[in-house]
């Protein structure tokens, strides 16, 4: 958007110095290596910003990118191998000198997927594969200048991974009955150092 470009023409200084804009960008491309192999690349980039003169600022954004390889083993079996990246972050700022501060937070994921589809016949398809996701979460970090009365704080980052395997069967028995069933097994792992707490029934910490 171009809203903030018009703010500069305002005669009111409290409006003139404000910030107001957002953007969204999508991009896609593909390349066929040969009859059995095709590469797909896609991405999304978005950002929103709001600022009130020299008082307050707030912004957030998303970035995602996907690289996918499609491979045909035969006329009945094909696979998709996907590498997916996503990042969400936001920033809050207070520009008042005596209480100035900046807050940052983000969630970043890396995802690897391997999917297969086997066509037993025109009405019977089996899908199976693996899914691995690694999470990095930065809950919050507060920074401030030396003259600010705000104390700096950094919440510990958290890292974890999910892994899953699945298989499903889609079977069109006739023109009125379509049967779909499957099985999925998943697990979650937490990595890295950090403080972890146990709580009792009253919500109080009983161990660290």
Residue ranges of model-derived segments:
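Short, structured coil/loop segments at alpha-helix boundaries
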Residues: 11-12, 34, 74, 174
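Surface-exposed loop/turn and secondary-structure junction residues enriched for glycine/proline
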Residues: 5-9, 23-25, 80, 166
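Signature of Gram-negative outer-membrane beta-barrel scaffolds
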Residues: 127-208
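General secondary-structure edge motif
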Residues: 9-10, 49, 96-97, 104, ...
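Outer-membrane beta-barrel domain signature, strongest for Gram-negative TonB-dependent receptors
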Residues: 20-138
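Short secondary-structure transition/capping segments
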Residues: 8-9, 52-53, 92, 192-193
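Surface-exposed beta-strand-turn/loop segments characteristic
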Residues: 2-19
